[in-house]
Amino acid sequence: MKKAIGAAVFYARFAIPFSRIGFRRRVGEAGLDADFSGQRWVVSGATGGIGRAIVLGAASRGATVRALGRDVRKLEALAKQATGAGRIQPVPVDLSLMREVARAASEIAAAGTVDVLVHNVGVMCHEFRQTPEGLELGFATNLLGHWVLDQGLRRGGALHGGSAIISMSSGGMYGAALDLEALQAPDAARHDGFTAYAQHKRAQVELTHYWNSLGPGQPRAWVMHPGWVDTDGVRSALPGFRKVFKPVLRTAQDGADTALWLAATRPDTGEGIWLDRHRDSEHAFGFTRAGAKATGLVPMLDVMATRATDGT
């Protein structure tokens, strides 16, 4: 009963702003007059939905985009769709495997600097699955892989003071106070895919605070969420939700808009999460303020990343 009441409150509060109606109210027909010529981008989760729209949007405005994804055929097809002066370079990588992510980061860094890094990949896993490295699949894909990619690019000198980091969170994080123990269940009996996903997305907010606390000469970071978008992930993970809200779900282009806008405008960093080119509070309910902070999250990610990449 408590869960049902919580869900009702959540949907009542966010149904309009997260829908296509909310996008039209805030962004409307405003275009994006941006020139990314000469910029090098890295986008994870590049072959579907929002990631694909970000890649195509950046390339059409002149960027060279390294598109990270697991499906080689989809990556190659995406590369052929580049328009304008930009290019799309496929980077085949399983973003749930930390050693593969570390390898990709090293290879990207060896090729030069990165102007925009978009942590877009995300998956909601209702069934408990572990990767060959012993990590829960959702945690590895949604959070630890972001950390490994970021750290690998930093160590390789690819990220610099002029770089932008944009993390694609989810409105689901509004219902979660960060709990480090809930980021990764140890077994199927204690796994809840919806709860874990919300935790991963809340953790992205804290990681953004951490990256912005590193001081001058470091990349600046923003965290955003796309609203409710009709993606393959929503179709497979939330079929009931999609059935109810399909008439007002956003397009992938709607979901990608704020990421492209942030990369173009580079607004001031600070607390908050971006939606539809506006900074909103990162807390809609008081209880989420009591969650864990980056001071606990970062050391945990660092240890787990080292174990996974070293094979220990």
Locations of regions flagged by a protein language model:
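Conserved glycine-rich cofactor-binding loop
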Residues: 40, 47-48
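C-terminal helical subdomain
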Residues: 17, 101, 243-285, 292-295, ...
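Conserved glycine-rich Rossmann-like NAD(P)H-binding loop of the short-chain dehydrogenase/reductase
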Residues: 61-77
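Non-catalytic terminal and boundary segments that flank Rossmann-like NAD(P)-dependent oxidoreductase
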Residues: 1-40, 292-312
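Rossmann-fold cofactor-recognition segment
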Residues: 82-99
